[in-house]
């Protein structure tokens, strides 16, 4: 089965190539913190030889509570992304929530992300696709992996085949998510690169009444399980002080654990991709 290669600058993204890291923090809390977090990701990924794209959100539009922190907004957020790109010479990925945001965000960011909750919103999908920029499509918690073909088709119909699929878990009753490992193989059949968002797969949506809970202690186990499927990349959020993060701290990896965590993931990815394909159909 031929696997599509998506190129972002000098980075090649495909299911049969060494994994790429989309990593950073959940939401931009401040310019200084974003710079600190990116600096550590760059240090570790350069040391380990892992292709890297910085990730953060300028707005968290789907917070549980009306009083929850959402971010600095698009205008200020894009200024921070521009500085990060200049300072660290890394690509940037961020999410958009409304059609009007697609074009200005695409002028700054190398990859734009379609949020899971919004992945069936046709007007948003088409607006993003028409930018021509690479799109990371999050699989909604309520969609089966085979249903992702419809979102791919919307993008392709709008003229964009620079697409990535991203698994982030499926709803399992109330306040819980599970990851169906068989879903990775189903999505890989579409031939586009498939990523695993281990951070949000650890969420317990609404688990703390006014915000999401999480299972940070299990991040290594779940990441290894997902990456054992031979994926194009990993989506990861880290924070220097997760317990005081302004969003999704319970799911975030401690920043000082980033290097030992990625050492193991790279070794696993190298091993899995060294195996020949065994046809069992």
Swiss-Prot record:
Its EC number is 2.5.1.55. It catalyses: D-arabinose 5-phosphate + phosphoenolpyruvate + H2O = 3-deoxy-alpha-D-manno-2-octulosonate-8-phosphate + phosphate. Pathway: Carbohydrate biosynthesis; 3-deoxy-D-manno-octulosonate biosynthesis; 3-deoxy-D-manno-octulosonate from D-ribulose 5-phosphate: step 2/3; Bacterial outer membrane biogenesis; lipopolysaccharide biosynthesis. Keywords: Cytoplasm, Lipopolysaccharide biosynthesis, Transferase. Transmembrane segments: none annotated. Belongs to the KdsA family. PANTHER family: PHOSPHO-2-DEHYDRO-3-DEOXYHEPTONATE ALDOLASE. This is 2-dehydro-3-deoxyphosphooctonate aldolase 1.
């Amino acid at each position: 089965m031929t696997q599509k290669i998506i190129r972002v600058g000098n980075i090649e993204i495909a299911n049969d190539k060494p994994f790429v890291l989309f990593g950073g923090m959940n939401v931009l809390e401040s310019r200084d913190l974003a710079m600190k977090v990116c600096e550590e990701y760059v240090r570790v990924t350069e040391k380990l030889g892992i292709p890297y794209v910085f990730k953060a959100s300028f707005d968290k539009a789907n917070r549980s509570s009306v009083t929850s922190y959402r971010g600095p907004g698009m205008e200020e957020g894009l200024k921070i992304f521009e500085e990060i790109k200049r300072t660290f010479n890394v690509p940037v990925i961020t999410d958009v929530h409304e059609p009007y945001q697609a074009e200005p965000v695409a002028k700054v960011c190398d990859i734009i992300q379609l949020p899971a909750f919004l992945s069936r919103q046709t007007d948003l999908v088409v607006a993003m696709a028409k930018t021509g920029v690479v799109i990371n499509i999050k699989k909604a918690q309520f969609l089966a992996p085979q249903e992702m073909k419809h979102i791919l088709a919307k993008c392709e119909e709008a003229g964009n085949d620079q697409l990535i699929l991203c698994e982030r878990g499926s709803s399992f009753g109330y306040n819980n998510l599970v990851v169906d490992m068989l879903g990775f193989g189903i999505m890989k059949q579409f031939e586009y690169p498939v990523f695993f968002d281990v951070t949000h797969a650890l969420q317990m949506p609404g688990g703390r009444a006014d915000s999401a809970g999480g299972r940070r202690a299990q991040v290594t186990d779940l990441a290894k399980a997902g990456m054992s499927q031979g994926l194009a990349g990993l989506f990861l959020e880290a924070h220097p002080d997760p317990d005081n993060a302004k969003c999704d701290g319970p799911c975030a990896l401690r920043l000082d654990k980033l290097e030992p965590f990625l050492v193991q993931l790279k070794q696993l990815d190298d091993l899995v991709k060294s195996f020949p394909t065994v046809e069992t159909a």
